[in-house]
Curated annotation (Swiss-Prot):
The keyword DNA repair does not apply. The keyword Ribosomal protein applies. This is Small ribosomal subunit protein uS8. The gene is rpsH. Keywords: Ribonucleoprotein, Ribosomal protein, RNA-binding, rRNA-binding. PANTHER family: 40S RIBOSOMAL PROTEIN S15A. PROSITE patterns: RIBOSOMAL_S8. Part of the 30S ribosomal subunit. Contacts proteins S5 and S12. InterPro entries: Ribosomal_uS8, Ribosomal_uS8_CS, Ribosomal_uS8_sf. One of the primary rRNA binding proteins, it binds directly to 16S rRNA central domain where it helps coordinate assembly of the platform of the 30S subunit. Transmembrane segments: none annotated. GO terms for biological process: translation. NCBIfam families: PRK00136.1. It comes from Roseobacter denitrificans (strain ATCC 33942 / OCh 114) (Erythrobacter sp. (strain OCh 114)). GO terms for molecular function: rRNA binding; structural constituent of ribosome.
Amino acid sequence: MNDPIADMLTRIRNSQLRGKSTVITPASKLRAWVLDVLADEGYIRGYEKITGADGHPAIEISLKYYEGEPVIRELKRVSKPGRRVYMGVNDIPVVRQGLGVSIVSTPKGVMSDQAARSANVGGEVLCTVF
């Protein structure tokens, strides 16, 4: 697997399109940090670290729906392994005029675009969520 973040985002997107309540993805610290931001922003109900069927660590993500529709309408990977996207604090994109969120990996940790602006740090823009 070349891009674990893109894999996790695709699993979430596909599971929501199928109406699943949970999705399981392999565990990593970066994935957990991204999920922390998604949970804090209200895009997922939460997640829990489990042991997968193969004995490897995994993460079970509880997806969130509102009136039967997925809360996440759009989930896009911005920085990719072949083309990293780094932005200063003033260049971090505003998603859908502030209705969405950019998830940024900064020297102070993985955080939302608003938190990065508050902390006055830039970094690698991992993905956008709306």
